[in-house]
Amino acid sequence: MGVLRIGHVSIKVMDMDAAVQHYEKVLGLKTTHKDADGNVYLKCWDEWDKYSLILTPSDQAGFNHVAFKVEKDSELDAFQQRVEAAGVKTQMLSEGTLPFTGRMLQFQLPSGHDFRLYAQKEFVGTDVGSTNPDPWPDDIRG
């Protein structure tokens, strides 16, 4: 049991239009969803999951959380016990707290950073496919 990889990062942005423009046109990310709260979800072209970056409107820039992906949903319960045994409070967030994402284990480190673990997120595949793929999409802009 262990963490597979960083699944997504959620950041606060003060100018959503400028941020989306930067991530799409300069870095080449792709918007995959916008929710009713004004959050914008983006993915890199070689990402398999629905999103890897969440932009949240805010009056100051900063990080909301970093989410790590684990292999199985059942591992979240074991991680909850392990994290709590280390003296860190946790909260299990229900499926759908974030769009297209299963339940998540949320905890805050003594440093004040908010982390989450999850196992399930909608799988959409890459922009180049997996059978003899091009090294990058034809329309990449970043």
Task: Show where each model-derived region lies.
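Conserved short beta-strand elements that form part of the metal-binding/catalytic scaffold
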Residues: 30-64, 114-121
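Loop/turn position at the start of each blade in beta-propeller repeats
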Residues: 4, 61, 100-102
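Vicinal oxygen chelate
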Residues: 13-17, 68-111
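N-terminal, well-ordered alpha-helical segments
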Residues: 7, 21, 38-40, 53, ...
